[in-house]
Amino acid sequence: MSKITKIKGFADLFPPESDVFTRMESVARQVFGRYGFVELRTPILERTDLFCRSIGTETDVVQKEMYTFPDRKDRSLTMRPEATAGVMRAYIESGRHTQEPVSKLFTSGPMFRYERPQKGRMRQFHQINCEVLGPVEPHADAELVLMLMRFLTELGLTGLSLQINSLGCKECRPLYRKALSDFLASIDNAALCEDCRRRMETNPLRVLDCKVPGCRELTANAPTILEHNCPECRTHFDAVLRILDSRNVPYVLNDRLVRGLDYYNRTTFEVVSDSIGSQGSVAGGGRYDGLISQLGGPDVPGVGFACGMERLALMMPGADAPRPHFHVAVLDPAAQDAALLLAEDLRAQGLTGSVGFGAGSIKSRMRLAGKSGARACLILGGDELAAGTVVVKDMDSGEQETIGRDAVAARLLAAGA
């Protein structure tokens, strides 16, 4: 019978990779908690309309990348390609806006996009997302960026570049769109890639986001969106930059930064690295003041970001996994019950470890103890079972001593094992 293998673009995560993800989530909870964020868990499956209305029907995500299928009642469902839309749906449905003026929410979990798998970019990938719902002030944008940079710093990441831009608002962006469309009409459209030719008609701002070198060269002299920001948008953006300057946070003004989703307005930002291959983005986000009302909710502004966990993992410095405190080597089958009870007593006192059940020679039992990585091996054979004792062997020094079974926990704790 042939074996069943995993789907292309999906991965199984064993230690140490899974340990990196656990550490990432732990640091996220610690940092975000200092800023007053609470954790939200949303479903992996949502109605397809949610993403069409939020992300935009003309985006690459909706056009080419979503895992969409009908259920048994022929309702179109989609495995979430990003988290923000689901958070907005949950926020509206729960009536949370009636309970508190400001909501600070974070989520983590798997997302799904049908893309070409590459380094740090899989078809099932994991994100950490933060959303601030309620404030319209630029201080919310700045605080979110500061929190993101603090999170990345506490992960131990270096060599990052914060890029930032302002996409304007519904008042000034149409003027820029017209100026950009006029510019695009004046260049050799045939030299643009197929995606850019399509975007010229549906969403010309996305042409600026194209990574094809030929397209970037052709659009190098395109008008910039910052030049077309209205006074209110420029004041908002300047306030964000002023706060970042006051905290000595370095950034790069990137007037081509438009992000890949249609719901962004005003502040948009991205953190990039040149050490992880194609495109190099590890986190990004921005303001989305019209998204909640666009999904049928109240007119509540918002700002948020997402971090790609696989991409962050490529950059995280190695960290030694904590060693188990003990491993019980059972040398006599008759001692297996006592070994299990001993291990349970030790675990009840906060110690971690394993028991080597099964038959085998003393040599094989000790080899298993060595592979466990434990600091101490607790040897329990027939003689020890009869005497109520345990041989405690220090796995680093090789020294060992025989002590009473009820003294083992104190011995391990005193040794700092």
Curated annotation (Swiss-Prot):
Q: Where are the transmembrane segments?
A: none
One term of GO molecular function = histidine-tRNA ligase activity
Supply one GO BP term: histidyl-tRNA aminoacylation
**Listed EC numbers:** 6.1.1.21
Q: Which superkingdom does the taxonomy of this entry point to?
A: Bacteria
> PROSITE patterns in the record, alphabetically?
AA_TRNA_LIGASE_II
Entry keywords, A to Z: Aminoacyl-tRNA synthetase, ATP-binding, Cytoplasm, Ligase, Nucleotide-binding, Protein biosynthesis
Subcellular location per the Swiss-Prot or TrEMBL entry: Cytoplasm
Q: Which reaction does it catalyse?
A: tRNA(His) + L-histidine + ATP = L-histidyl-tRNA(His) + AMP + diphosphate + H(+)
Q: What is its main location?
A: cytoplasm
Q: Which GO terms describe its cellular component?
A: cytoplasm
**PANTHER family from the entry?**
HISTIDINE--TRNA LIGASE, MITOCHONDRIAL-RELATED (PTHR43707:SF1), HISTIDYL-TRNA SYNTHETASE (PTHR43707)
Q: Which family does it belong to?
A: Belongs to the class-II aminoacyl-tRNA synthetase family.
Quaternary structure?
Homodimer.
This protein is called what?
Histidine--tRNA ligase
What species does this protein belong to?
A: Nitratidesulfovibrio vulgaris (strain ATCC 29579 / DSM 644 / CCUG 34227 / NCIMB 8303 / VKM B-1760 / Hildenborough)
